[in-house]
Amino acid sequence: MLAWPAPLLPTLPGSGPVLTLHDTARGEVVPTTPDTTARMYVCGITPYDATHLGHAATYLAFDLVNRVWRDAGHAVHYVQNVTDIDDPLLERAERDGEDWVVLGMRETALFREDMTALRVLPPDDYVGAVESVPRIVAHVETLLDEGLAYVLDDGTGDVYHDIAQAPGFGSESGYDEATMLRFSAERGGDPDRPGKRNRLDPMLWRGRRPGEPSWPGPRGVAGRPGWHIECATIALETIGMGFDVQGGGSDLVFPHHEFSAVHAEALTATVTGEKLPFARAYVHAAMIGLDGEKMSKSRGNLVFVSKLRGEGVDPMAIRLALLAGHYRTDRAWTPDLLAGAEQRLATWRRAVTRDAGAPAAEVLQGLRERLADDLDSPGAIALVDAWAERTLAATADEQEEGAPTIVCDAVDALLGVALQGC
């Protein structure tokens, strides 16, 4: 599957420090320790509707991770999936009387347009669940053969992972059983289904149902894959185990990231004989709210990137508005937030069109330090605000030739905000 065009990254003098990030599994900010190539997997969209600002905030957060790593001298192998077969997609297609394939392709194309407009660096591997079905089936077969999964005894052909045989289950989220059961019911699980060995056992394969698409499956049972095994398979097939960052929204902590890790670690153990970690760090972006509630498709309280673009809003203002809050802080989208970002963008652009400005070296160093410190984008933005104010207010003898160009390039390369005319 094709991703989207990569924006040009300006080359900055020197290099940035080690990136630290908050690891959900350890509950603390830790240094990332990539090898020569940093590896990151970020869970992608289910393409049944347009990109809303909650999505955008998540992908902008991990775009900063990508940029900071590159500035520190790492090559980056970035993988993102597309959940192009799942219940919400099929339900929306049926509701609207539209072919599910056509719906998924259209919304994926719109997502690409939004990411291009927001200047998000594209993944190196952009992989759909549908194209991964043969490998998913092979993985489910392996889990069945090893006695780690079972077929539900109700004639459906549905296959579940037996989490009683998953050492370390729960270590990624740290949730107790009651919390897991609640989130499982709210986020696509089926804890009350009869016949399961454990209420939390996740589905690996859903046997064919009337009116649903299906593919040849494990043990000859046609159907479609479960959600979590899709990401486990795609990660294993692209960047392998022990990658540096597993990323996504905070609503993916459980069950999705927990079970993706369980599946991948079980599959790897069948080969190596030992439990290896799926990811070194689990990093989660907070929610964007509107009118006091989390922005979500199920609630319908959405602000779409494409709609704002269609109204003439500069995508760089959208980007700045979302980066004005820390990625781990739940925050609200308001007209005032966008208006403030538009004003900030205009001020920065005025400042970088000058031939000379306030000294740039400390701004570049400060941007690097702030973003390397668990993606402190509000702190980074405040540094540029202060520089722009000094530049626009200073007299000629207080200014440094070429400083605006350096700041312009730094804002572009590190924050991903393109400033025109510099």
Curated annotation (Swiss-Prot):
- What's a Gene Ontology MF term here? cysteine-glucosaminylinositol ligase activity
Catalytic activity entry: 1D-myo-inositol 2-amino-2-deoxy-alpha-D-glucopyranoside + L-cysteine + ATP = 1D-myo-inositol 2-(L-cysteinylamino)-2-deoxy-alpha-D-glucopyranoside + AMP + diphosphate + H(+)
Q: Which Pfam families match?
A: tRNA-synt_1e
Sequence motif 'KMSKS' region, location on chain = 294-298
Cite the binding residues for L-cysteinyl-5'-AMP: C43, G44, I45, T46, T58, N81, V82, T83, W227, G249, S250, D251, I288
Keywords, comma-separated and alphabetical? ATP-binding, Ligase, Metal-binding, Nucleotide-binding, Zinc
Q: Where is this region: Disordered?
A: 185-221
**Gene3D superfamilies under this entry?**
Anticodon-binding domain of a subclass of class I aminoacyl-tRNA synthetases, HUPs
**Motif span ('ERGGDP' region)?**
186-191
Under the heading InterPro entries, the entry gives: Cys-tRNA/MSH_ligase, Mycothiol_ligase_MshC, Rossmann-like_a/b/a_fold, tRNA-synt_1_cat_dom
Listed Basic and acidic residues bias regions: 185-200
Q: Which cofactor does it need?
A: Zn(2+)
Question: Could you give the cofactor binding note from the entry?
Answer: Binds 1 zinc ion per subunit.
Q: Name one cellular component (GO) term.
A: cytosol
Q: Which HAMAP family match?
A: MshC
Role this protein plays: Catalyzes the ATP-dependent condensation of GlcN-Ins and L-cysteine to form L-Cys-GlcN-Ins.
Q: Describe the subunit structure.
A: Monomer.
Q: Which family does it belong to?
A: Belongs to the class-I aminoacyl-tRNA synthetase family. MshC subfamily.
Q: What is this protein called?
A: L-cysteine:1D-myo-inositol 2-amino-2-deoxy-alpha-D-glucopyranoside ligase
Query: Which organism is this entry from?
Result: Geodermatophilus obscurus (strain ATCC 25078 / DSM 43160 / JCM 3152 / CCUG 61914 / KCC A-0152 / KCTC 9177 / NBRC 13315 / NRRL B-3577 / G-20)
Encoding gene (name): mshC
